[in-house]
Curated annotation (Swiss-Prot):
Signal peptide interval: none
Main location: nucleus
A GO term for molecular function: ribonucleoprotein complex binding
GO CC, any one term: nucleoplasm
Location of region: Ubiquitin-like (UBL) domain: 13-97
Name the UniProt record assigns to this protein: Ribosome biogenesis protein WDR12 homolog
Nucleus found in the keyword field: yes
Keyword Metal-binding set for record: no
WD repeat residues: 109-146, 148-190, 197-236, 265-303, 305-345, 352-392, 396-432
HAMAP family, alphabetized: WDR12 (MF_03029)
InterPro entries: G-protein_beta_WD-40_rep, NLE, WD40/YVTN_repeat-like_dom_sf, WD40_repeat_CS, WD40_repeat_dom_sf, WD40_rpt, WDR12/Ytm1
Keywords noted in UniProt: Nucleus, Repeat, Ribosome biogenesis, rRNA processing, WD repeat
Length: 432
């Protein structure tokens, strides 16, 4: 099939367009298209074919295109030449709805490195090397500050948030975790309890889906699970949380809390943890291992040998996939954790970063997309169907990116060694 308005082109390529979404299926017709065509012209071609098949979509919908899992960012001729592909063979080009580019929204400047970030509604929770955690809104207004740790805050997580109160957890280099309550609309914060049990730095923390348990991982090689219930009882041990910290009620007391469960098995420090299912946690760190644990019986179900130190992991909310960032020239590896024979399956790799991948976060609304942050100062937005190049590379940081978050679909948030929180806003595409 040759489109009429393309007959003026002197060089034609045989192209088969294949839709990844049935909504946009054009039946895979074989087309003769000008080699000069790029994404804009191919999008127009798809619209023409859809209209010919009586499929109505808004004119504003644009498409991305990929050949052999590599995003097309050049003309067809440029791509074919750069990859030494035959111009005599049929070239299969897959297409899918284009992701709108993230728009810069705001920069929040801090006094020290930002080690962790988590967004919730219109709020950002961040932990810093200055020993504090803070909550800001997206406009950069500081809502609350949490002081009490004796060293860096390495990890933060929201436990709950309603119109009146928010509960958070912080994990610190001082070997402790603290649960805090913030009275929304005020600067009032209270340390509810201090979790003690680790003997070295607590590097990361996460919360289960029901918000009843916390999991922490540490340089002491241990995994500890704690209850989020900090109810005070008559026999609870209490102590001042900070000599200089007072509220309207006077010096606050915090409950000392011990872990419910301790899991051992890693042979070196642990840097990353996620809790994708109610009875399953996944941990990773310096022993080159990703470990999957059954929290109900407290056993290590399976291991993935990455052969590199793992700095960050994320899990797809939609499918059995684990993405891991490690100490090897910026490669992100995606694994299927289901064991086949005696091994897990390496599904694919994402390659574009030029340094250590420090943090990852999967989209909560799109099973194909995730974001990554790296010591190369960039944040990248990926579609795993096109693993050879990111959809977008965001270059707002001036030093290492240490944390990324995509908990809220409309905001991509990152923190780094440049003392900055960068906020990017997304247009959430309407998809079928």
């Amino acid at each position: 099939m040759e489109l009429e308005n393309d007959k003026t082109s002197s060089k034609q390529l045989q192209i088969r367009l294949v839709a990844l979404n049935k909504r946009f299926d054009t039946s895979g017709n074989l087309l003769s298209l000008p080699s000069r065509f790029g994404c804009d012209e191919l999008s127009e071609t798809v619209h023409t074919l859809l209209s010919a098949n009586d499929i109505e979509i808004p004119a504003s919908v644009q498409f991305d295109f990929a050949i052999n899992n590599d995003l097309l960012r050049d003309s067809l001729e440029g791509y074919v030449t750069s990859k030494n592909l035959s111009t005599e063979s049929v070239i299969e080009v897959v297409y899918f709805q284009k992701e709108p580019p993230p728009d810069f929204l705001n920069t929040i400047l801090h006094s020290d490195w930002i080690k962790s970030v988590r967004s919730k509604d219109d709020c950002i929770l961040a932990g810093s090397l200055d020993g504090t955690a803070r909550i800001w809104n997206m406009a950069g207004e500081e809502y609350a500050i949490f002081k009490g740790h004796e060293s860096y805050v390495n990890g933060v997580e929201w436990i709950s948030k309603d119109n009146n109160h928010a509960t958070i957890v912080t994990a610190s280099q001082d070997g402790t975790l603290r649960l805090w309550e913030w009275a929304i609309g005020t600067k009032s914060v209270e340390c509810l309890c201090e979790c003690k049990g680790h003997t070295q730095a607590v590097n990361a923390v996460t919360v289960n889906q029901s918000k009843t348990k916390i999991c922490s991982v540490s340089s002491d090689k241990m995994i500890k699970i704690w209850s989020t219930d900090c109810s005070r009882k008559d026999d609870d041990t209490t102590h001042p949380i900070h000599k200089k910290m007072k509220t309207n009620q006077g010096l606050q007391k915090a409950v000392d809390k011990l872990p419910d469960i301790t899991l051992s098995g890693h042979t070196d420090g642990i840097d990353a943890v996620v809790w994708p299912k109610e009875a399953e946690i996944i941990t990773a760190g310096w022993d080159h291992r990703i470990k999957i644990w059954d929290t109900e019986v407290g056993v290590n179900k399976s291991d993935i040998n990455v052969n590199k130190v793992v700095k960050g992991i994320t899990c797809s909310p939609f499918q059995d996939l684990i993405a891991a960032g490690s100490f090897d020239e910026g490669i992100i590896r995606l694994y299927d954790p289901r064991v086949v024979g005696d091994q897990t399956v390496l599904k694919l790799t994402l390659k574009s970063h030029k340094n250590i991948v420090s943090s990852l976060c999967w989209s909560t609304t799109d099973e194909q997309q995730l974001v990554s942050g790296s010591f190369d100062n960039t944040v990248k937005l990926w579609d795993i169907r096109c693993n050879l190049a990111p959809l977008y590379s965001i270059e707002g940081h001036e030093d290492k990116v240490l944390a990324v978050d995509w908990s809220e679909p409309q905001y991509i948030v990152s923190g780094g060694a440049d003392n900055r929180i960068q906020i990017y806003q997304r247009e959430v595409a309407q998809r079928s």
